[in-house]
A protein has these predicted regions:
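Short, strongly hydrophobic alpha-helical membrane anchors
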Residues: 1-18
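Loop-to-helix transition at the N-terminal end of transmembrane alpha-helices
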Residues: 18, 22, 45-62, 93-94
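Central hydrophobic cores of alpha-helical transmembrane segments in multi-pass inner-membrane proteins
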Residues: 26-38, 72-73, 98-104
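Membrane-interface helix-loop junction between the first two transmembrane segments
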Residues: 32-52
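Residue-level signal for inorganic ion chemistry
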Residues: 34, 55, 223
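Membrane-embedded catalytic scaffold of the fatty acid hydroxylase/desaturase
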Residues: 59-68, 87-240
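Membrane-interface helix termini and inter-helical loops of multi-pass transporters
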Residues: 76-86
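Cytosolic/stromal cytosol-facing helical appendages immediately following the last transmembrane segment
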Residues: 130-134, 181-327
């Protein structure tokens, strides 16, 4: 094949399957194996109704994705027409696309926790008070409504073909599946420093004030380290999973749509000048400060920790306090 033909081949989009379709059997097998592990070592890690809800979330998300896939593809191809360059299907382009797509996911994921409109869709993934591989299946039914796909459009505008972007996005999703487990504690420090791991992602699913809105990474934890959103798992503080205001129900439709219902109620009842705030400000925001956001919860916790620390120091320095013996 001549040089011109090779160059043309690199520019022609290949037929790429959805890698997630091929990973589903492995997902099922790993969930089964984790269930066996939990039955022997930690029976409380799985709750039948919770697991069934997670499976229903996954099924519904698949159906919703199939319904909206055509519209997302059409918009992606339309944006691709106005690309700044044409990036070939070369080995280096695949690596660049994978890394940049993971950064786009970080931006999306961080936004999904900081803007209530996007949180209304993403909250589905955090609604379980258990943390196991079935939790990974809790994907949104309303991602298209929330416009989450917009965060990948800049890659196509830059010149990556939509087929490449969707394929590496599938790989990203596959990677994130296995980190939803408590069966694995920690990896070697070099791996924990670069990659997202079960330990890092457990932090992300926590409701503890120390951990709220941290570790947004998909594959590479370096984004959190770079942008100040990384927090390590602390062994002496057990993680509490779920959302700040727990649902207290396994009702599937309520689990899927409860935050959208909450937005509608708040927008309807809010003063005119504050209506948009209930869609675009952080979850928990109110115009009168009557509810907590993750920031106010963390600030109150930090103040409490500082007070405990100062009280402890004052007690140790007080006259008559027992001083520790020198080594």
């Amino acid at each position: 094949m001549g040089g011109g033909a090779k160059a043309s081949a690199r520019m022609t989009p290949p037929h790429l399957p959805n890698p997630v379709d091929y990973a589903v059997p492995a997902f099922v097998l790993l969930i089964f194996l984790e269930m066996l592990w939990a039955r022997r070592h930690a029976p409380e890690k799985y709750e039948p109704k919770d697991t069934l809800a997670s499976l229903a979330f996954g099924l519904g998300s698949t159906v919703a994705g199939a319904i909206t896939a055509g519209a997302v593809l059409a918009m992606s191809l339309w944006v691709y027409q106005y690309r700044l360059a044409t990036i070939p299907f070369a080995w280096w382009a695949w690596i660049a696309c994978f890394v940049l797509d993971d950064f786009a996911y970080y931006v999306f994921h961080r936004t999904a926790h900081r803007v209530r409109w996007f949180w209304a869709s993403h909250v589905n993934h955090h609604s379980s008070q258990h943390y196991n591989l079935s939790t990974a299946l809790r994907q949104s039914w309303t991602g298209f409504i929330a416009l989450g796909f917009l965060f990948r459009l800049p890659l196509m505008l830059a010149g990556f073909h939509p087929a490449m972007v969707f394929f590496v996005g599938g790989l990203n999703l596959i990677y994130q599946f296995w980190i939803h487990t408590e069966a694995i504690q920690r990896f070697p420090p070099w791996f924990e420093a670069v990659m997202n791991t079960p330990s890092h992602h457990r932090v992300h699913h926590a409701t503890n004030p120390r951990y709220l809105d941290r570790n947004y990474a998909g594959v590479f934890i370096i984004w959190d380290r770079m942008f100040g959103t990384f927090t390590p798992e602390v062994e002496e503080e057990p993680i509490r999973y779920g959302i700040v205001k727990q649902l207290g129900s396994f009702n599937l439709l309520w689990s899927v749509f409860h935050e959208w219902v909450g937005i509608a109620r708040d927008v309807w009842s809010a003063p005119f000048g504050h209506k948009l705030g209930y869609m675009w400000r952080p979850p928990g925001w109110t115009h009168d400060g009557s509810r907590d956001t993750s920031d106010t919860i963390r600030e109150r916790w930090q103040e409490n920790q500082a007070w405990k620390s100062s009280t402890s120091s004052s007690s140790a320095e007080a006259p008559g306090a027992v001083q520790p013996l020198a080594d």
